[in-house]
From Swiss-Prot:
BP GO annotations: tricarboxylic acid cycle
Biological source species: Streptomyces viridochromogenes (strain DSM 40736 / JCM 4977 / BCRC 1201 / Tue 494)
Binding site for [4Fe-4S] cluster: C472, C538, C541
Effect of disrupting the coding gene: Mutant is unable to develop aerial mycelium and to sporulate, resulting in a bald phenotype. Furthermore, the mutant does not produce the antibiotic phosphinothricin tripeptide (PTT), suggesting a defect in physiological differentiation. It is also sensitive to oxidative and temperature stress. Mutant cannot be complemented by pmi.
Name this polypeptide is given: Aconitate hydratase A
Names of required cofactors: [4Fe-4S] cluster
Pathway field: Carbohydrate metabolism; tricarboxylic acid cycle; isocitrate from oxaloacetate: step 2/2
GO molecular function: 2-methylisocitrate dehydratase activity; 4 iron, 4 sulfur cluster binding; aconitate hydratase activity; metal ion binding; RNA binding
Function statement: Catalyzes the reversible isomerization of citrate to isocitrate via cis-aconitate in the tricarboxylic acid (TCA) cycle. Aconitase activity is important for the initiation of morphological and physiological differentiation of S.viridochromogenes. In addition, the apo form of AcnA (lacking the [4Fe-4S] cluster) functions as a RNA-binding regulatory protein, which binds to iron responsive elements (IREs) located on the untranslated region of certain mRNAs, including recA and ftsZ. Binding to IRE-like structures probably alters the target mRNA stability and regulates the protein amount.
Amino acid sequence: MSANSFDARSTLQVGDESYEIFRLDKVEGSARLPYSLKVLLENLLRTEDGANITADHIRALGGWDSQAQPSQEIQFTPARVIMQDFTGVPCVVDLATMREAVKELGGDPAKINPLAPAELVIDHSVIADKFGTNDAFKQNVELEYGRNKERYQFLRWGQTAFDEFKVVPPGTGIVHQVNIEHLARTVMVRGGQAYPDTLVGTDSHTTMVNGLGVLGWGVGGIEAEAAMLGQPVSMLIPRVVGFKLTGELKPGTTATDLVLTITEMLRGHGVVGKFVEFYGEGVAATSLANRATIGNMSPEFGSTAAIFPIDDETLNYLRLTGRSEQQVALVESYAKEQGLWLDPAAEPDFSEKLELDLSTVVPSIAGPKRPQDRIVLAEAAQQFAKDVLNYVEAPAAQPAASASPVDEASAESFPASDAPAYGSQENGAGAPQHADGTGAAVPSNPVTVTAPDGTSYEIDHGAVTVAAITSCTNTSNPYVMVAAALVAKKAVEKGLTRKPWVKTTLAPGSKVVTDYFEKSGLTPYLDKVGFNLVGYGCTTCIGNSGPLPEEVSKAVNDHDLAVTSVLSGNRNFEGRINPDVKMNYLASPPLVVAYALAGSMKVDITKDALGTDQDGNPVYLKDIWPSEAEVNDVVANAIGEDMFSKSYSDVFAGDAQWQALPIPTGNTFEWDPESTYVRKPPYFEGMEMEPAPVEDIAGARVLAKLGDSVTTDHISPAGAIKADTPAGKYLTEHGVERRDFNSYGSRRGNHEVMIRGTFANIRLRNQIAPGTEGGYTRDFTKDDAPVSFIYDASRNYIEQGIPLVVLAGKEYGSGSSRDWAAKGTALLGVKAVIAESYERIHRSNLIGMGVLPLQFPEGQSAATLGLTGEETFSFSGVTELNNGTTPRTVKVTTDTGVEFDAVVRIDTPGEADYYRNGGIMQYVLRSLIRK
């Protein structure tokens, strides 16, 4: 119930329905705010409680100074939570564990349910193993179920056990496309109230829904769990960059060309930690599908969100996708009543401004390794000839460009798609990077390959070995998808097909795509050029491209060929799309088809022939490129509201395989002691209703002493599990074959694997174990403190009751927002971290897991204080938290005589409550039982 200090509670009549709303015009200054901040303002008005959210917070947002640096913290309560399976499974594991804890404390386990609607779409597990055949989809689904049966059984139980929790089963679509086509409300209705639809998601590209006027972004699992359980998300009131659009796109240019141009502009400007908001006359000329493509790539821009206001185009899309007339009428009435309707002539207050004339956008691709490295299509072959030198001619001699934190966060998000998290000093500005390679000859090393059917062909540097129509970024956009299918049709009619070394895949983000291909008669043409359906899921975009054909892979590796991929995704970092492929290019779906026909990045597809027709005449791209009228004609005739309504009528039901999964019944989950994917974590063991008093920390040893810019991927890697590591040994001991290890990302529901993977990144350098790389430390419980695995040493410390501490440099915990970086740290027995500075989300996650984040005094560090990591540490003054106050500093002393006052980085009253309770889950659990 809102405190309603501003007398903002009112009613809105729409047809026969009446809704309670909170009027923005009751707050002075609200009219000049950007759309995105108006949405936040309504959120504060509606959730004002006088404690976490006060009238002062509301006034601060109403009186927002567009030129000030962000400093005011506010508590944002998202309307709902969206998840995918990699990042969502651990959230559901925690909910299931909370139910058991409630039962053990004498409460009703059925009380533990998401308080905000939570929806999980299974899309991250399908791998494009099989391709180029009519049964590729069926085979890939069977392989997916084989690999993921334990996880799927668990999610199937969750689907039946929890209220307000829904699961979209595998083989249905990609989370963000399902979100815009079906789940998003634009205006929410709950308990008789109408308010803007907002969300947080456990995936970096959650921002796709910004195209629909819905404010939301990616967060880590701990924040998502908190939001599900009704806790607000802490954030700073951001700067807002106004991005003015004028004019309209020229025929022949696509949404992909537009978004790559915007990526280049925004990365050049620097928008980390900021909202980007589109305005101006050109917004009306930007289709909703194009807006969604732009919103999707907000993480690649570096921004928190990239949002479009509500207008007629929004309403048309809601109608097209089968939303009810009452819902569409509500969205229109609410937006107009609250000043959220787009006025193309208005210029709200913005912190910074950029402008793009849409008519200047030209056909483009981006690569070979970063999404902001845009290349004009007409110059792509020339630029490839220069860039390939970095991969062929003595790569060691090439000076490595230092990765920006935006690139690092994005690159590390494979395959789990964790949300990015950046340090406070970073704005993400940076120019595109390309080799100049002037005057150098294009390297060539042709290799003959023999296919299983006995035919042979030559491949060389630059061969396109993967051509993937993939990713919700583009498969949600009917215009580029139909254009791709028409390129395929015209190519087939001219007698062209893909080159034999190209692995071609089609993996749309929803079944609507294949429905309109079928209805328009275009499916057979896509099949004929090799773009058979391989799955409905992320596939190649997150690196699940599956292996190249054996003979191609062998030739590439034996001869060290710099081969390429072309994909319609959103990220293209080196080695992430396929381990055999060094250079990756982002392109629109029709260009993906064109490059599959050309077979090499050396081909200038704007001038060179892609092949020859039946009569031996050269066929050029212009001969098979569809006109805008042809594309629009198919879209108009093949896509209608009935298609979306039918496709989503039973979206949560799943296929026969899903429905046949054996699932336990009841309010609590029956944990399988043999499972290596899903296990009950120990967060609540021994927990009582009253939290034990906070204690000072004495006799602590250093587990790791780390440098600057240690990312969450260093702390908790998401990628492959090596056999000779504690996690690999654990899986081997539990009967898992090495080929079935899967990734850390897929095993986040098993704390035993994840603890062993904490600080286990092969690139980690622990300064107390010099000369080592990876998860090593020195074990001071043993004579001479030998080098040991971090996990093994932590068990010895825990056995002897010795608390642990981590020492770190600047920007500790940057990269992606990965909850296991904090969970793993806590489960290793770490009680405190002392760093020079923190990334904001990781700092709050540490508190959420009961770990104390401390900061060295200004200008001091482990080095200036002479700390080696061999000391024993004690911390006094922490107990002040028992008196209801948070100490500004605590006294740190070592057995070597070093003393200093460390700054306590518990920054809000809510965080202090979490820490006193031993963590956020314990706090929420006690609160729910008391209710």
